[in-house]
């Protein structure tokens, strides 16, 4: 109980004073790993679904890199350009671990992320890396992107529709547990979630967080299906779908 109390305290500090300091992040990871070791129903593992591919693209032509990672427990994704962080983070979802504490957990699925290179020019040529991290292991896939020619006539993207850059593609979790469906955008947006063409409303079971994530408590078999995350602003919207699969309940360890 001391470990869970300390983890709860660290989570409060993290949420109150982001970004997370290295020492605090290390402490959270250590305690989260202890929870995983005691309650995960399968060993930790992580895999790149499809590696990035190197590309030669014309200057000024918007280009997207996509990265999908299968993992237990669920992974985070961040992107690097020539070794420097440019998008995402490696902060784990410790809040869900707290909500499921003391229960057997599956915490398995696929997360996806896209990195958009807007109006690229020669300075955008280089090494792009997608890095997946599940608290136990780190995995990386790399692409060399070369920009050929100059960019011209590029428009500012300050007044543009949002883009969903990180989301849960699929998630397996045990019935009776909490499951988080992740959805993050590249700018401040209004969030909407749909299920079976119906609006998901905040209540005792469903909570849409300010960062876009959907938290579903006490999942049951009837919760299985496709959920649609929608990010909106005054210039348009973006959508991504995720599939939730509740698994048969097992006894706590």
UniProtKB/Swiss-Prot annotation:
It holds the Pfam family I-set. PROSITE patterns: IG_LIKE. GO terms for biological process: neuron development. Expressed in PVT, ASK, BAG, M2 and ASI neurons. In L1 larvae, expressed in pharyngeal ectoderm and mesoderm. Required for maintaining axon position of PVQ and PVP neurons postembryonically in the ventral nerve cord (VNC) by preventing axons drifting into the opposite side of the VNC that could occur during body growth and movement. Residues 43-146, 162-245 form the Ig-like C2-type domain. The gene is zig-4. Disruption phenotype: At the L1 larval stage, display defects in the positioning of the ventral nerve cord (VNC) axons characterized by axons of embryonically generated PVQ and PVP neurons, but not of RMEV, HSN and AVK neurons, from the left and right VNC drifting into the opposite cord (axon flip-over). These defects are not enhanced in a zig-3 (tm924) mutant background or in zig-3 (tm924) dig-1 (ky188), zig-3 (tm924) sax-7 (nj48) or zig-3 (tm924) egl-15 (n484) mutant background. In a zig-1, zig-2, zig-3 or zig-5 or zig-8 mutant background, cell body positioning of ASI and ASH head neurons is normal. CDD domains: Ig. SUPFAM superfamilies: Immunoglobulin (SSF48726). Keywords: Disulfide bond, Immunoglobulin domain, Repeat, Secreted, Signal. It is found in: Secreted. GO terms for cellular component: extracellular region. Gene3D superfamilies: Immunoglobulins. This is Zwei Ig domain protein zig-4. InterPro entries: Ig-like_dom, Ig-like_dom_sf, Ig-like_fold, Ig_I-set, Ig_sub, Ig_sub2, Neural/epithelial_adhesion. Disulfide bonds join 67-130, 183-229. Residues 1-16 form the signal peptide.
């Amino acid at each position: 109980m001391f470990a869970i109390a300390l983890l709860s305290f660290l989570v409060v500090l993290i949420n109150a004073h982001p970004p997370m300091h290295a020492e605090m992040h290390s402490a959270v990871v250590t305690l989260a790993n202890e929870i995983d070791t005691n309650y995960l129903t399968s060993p930790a593992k992580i895999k790149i679904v499809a590696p990035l591919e190197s590309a030669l693209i014309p200057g000024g032509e918007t280009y997207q890199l996509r990265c999908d990672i299968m993992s237990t427990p669920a992974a985070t994704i961040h992107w690097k350009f020539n070794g420097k962080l440019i998008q995402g983070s490696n902060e784990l979802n410790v809040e869900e671990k707290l909500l499921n504490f003391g229960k057997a957990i599956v915490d398995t699925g696929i997360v996806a992320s896209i990195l958009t290179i807007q109006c690229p020019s020669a300075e955008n040529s280089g090494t792009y890396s997608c890095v997946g991290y599940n608290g136990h292991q780190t995995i990386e896939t790399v692409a060399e992107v070369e920009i050929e020619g100059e960019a011209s006539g590029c428009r500012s993207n300050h007044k543009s529709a949002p883009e969903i850059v990180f989301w849960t593609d699929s998630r397996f979790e045990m019935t009776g547990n909490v499951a988080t469906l992740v959805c993050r955008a590249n700018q401040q947006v209004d969030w909407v979630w749909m299920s079976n063409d119906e609006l998901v409303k905040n209540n005792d079971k469903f909570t849409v967080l300010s960062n876009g994530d959907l938290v579903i408590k006490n999942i049951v078999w009837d919760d299985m299906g496709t959920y649609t995350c929608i990010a909106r602003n005054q210039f348009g919207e973006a959508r991504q779908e995720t599939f939730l699969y509740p698994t048969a309940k097992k006894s706590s360890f």
